[in-house]
Every structure is written in structure tokens, then in C-alpha cells.
């Protein structure tokens, strides 16, 4: 009877506490933020990587994720994971969360020019068409938890929610779960990141 009680207690405890080492949890979080920073850099390089356009327009969702969601997700899938073991899953999840697309819009615009009548020598104005090229960059962030929900079974999702409620027994890890990156909401490609000191 005592053995059964102990076994049950151990199981519940295991379902509420992160089992990976702090360094691996923070390491995986750092690696995911690195993917986000690389994405931000790619967006900022758009005029350099795609020169020769008259205008660059950006349609950007915020680049951000909740580190608690990522850690609870990885723990649900792998339990006592190491930083190196989850590299493939980090990249796979990142590709599902973010979608970057680009396209070119060509507009026909008109400019006013002054011409000289060859017969009378009198100047006059006319409209001359020209092409105006706009390079569009769009970033969609589906949200990390949307991706997580699609990945997990019902039983796994319940376990994930427990980790979220308990913060895996380690509330000190991310200081309340500040997002990995932020945006000023202006729709410009410049995204300012605030990296926690412990990362």
C-alpha cells in the first residue's frame, strides 16, 4: 500500500516539474531566440539583398514567443532533454510558427514633363508613364502555442497545461515569462530585442 502511494506521488511530481537541467532549458531558449534574431536580421537586410526597387513595404507580425510555452512543450515531448537533443525540434517548430514571404508590385505611374512643339516651338506639359516597383515583405507569426496545440495529443496537452500552471517548479527561470523579442508596432523591419541577463 505504501509502495503504491509513493509511486503515485512520484508520478504526479514528475508531471509538474521540469526534469531537464537549468542550463539545457536556458540553452534551448537561447537557441530559439537566436533563430528569431536571425529572422529579424534577414528582414532588415531586405533593401541590401533585394536592391533596385523604388520602395520597400513591410507587413510584419511581432517576433516573439513565451519561453515558458517552449520549455513546457519540450518537457512534454522529451522529459529530461538536453540542449543538443532538441535542436531539430526547435528549427521545425520555428518554421511552423513563422512564415516569411516576399513579392514585387509593379505600378504604372505618370510624371509631368515639359515638351517643345517641334512646329511652333511652344512648350507644353504632358503625362509620361513609368514603372514604379515596390518590394513587399510579409511576416506571419502564428503564435507558438498554436503550433504546440497542433503537435500534442489530448493527454500531452493536459500535461503541457500542468507545466504552464506550475512553471515546472522553477519560477526563477524566465522571471515571469517575458517575451524573447518585441516590436514597436510601427510595421517597420527594425525590431528591438531585450535579452534577459540570465540568457
Where are these regions (language model features)?
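Membrane-proximal envelope biogenesis segments
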Residues: 1-198
Amino acid at each position: 500500500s505504501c509502495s503504491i502511494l509513493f509511486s503515485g506521488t512520484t508520478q504526479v511530481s514528475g508531471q509538474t516539474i521540469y526534469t531537464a537541467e537549468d542550463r539545457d532549458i536556458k540553452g534551448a531558449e537561447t537557441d530559439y531566440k537566436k533563430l528569431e534574431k536571425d529572422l529579424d536580421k534577414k528582414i532588415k537586410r531586405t533593401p541590401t539583398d533585394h536592391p533596385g526597387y523604388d520602395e520597400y513595404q513591410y507587413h510584419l507580425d511581432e517576433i516573439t514567443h513565451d519561453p515558458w510555452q517552449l520549455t513546457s512543450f519540450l518537457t512534454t515531448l522529451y522529459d529530461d532533454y538536453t540542449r543538443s537533443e532538441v535542436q531539430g525540434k526547435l528549427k521545425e517548430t520555428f518554421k511552423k510558427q513563422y512564415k516569411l514571404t516576399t513579392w514585387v508590385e509593379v505600378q504604372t505611374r505618370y510624371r509631368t514633363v515639359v515638351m517643345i512643339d517641334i512646329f511652333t516651338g511652344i512648350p507644353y506639359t504632358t503625362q509620361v508613364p513609368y514603372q514604379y516597383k515596390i518590394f513587399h515583405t510579409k511576416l506571419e507569426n502564428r503564435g507558438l502555442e498554436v503550433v504546440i496545440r497542433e503537435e500534442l495529443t489530448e493527454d500531452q496537452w493536459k500535461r503541457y497545461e500542468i507545466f504552464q500552471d506550475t512553471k515546472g517548479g522553477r519560477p526563477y527561470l524566465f522571471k515571469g515569462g517575458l517575451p524573447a523579442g518585441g516590436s514597436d508596432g510601427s510595421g517597420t523591419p527594425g525590431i528591438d530585442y531585450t535579452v534577459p541577463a540570465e540568457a
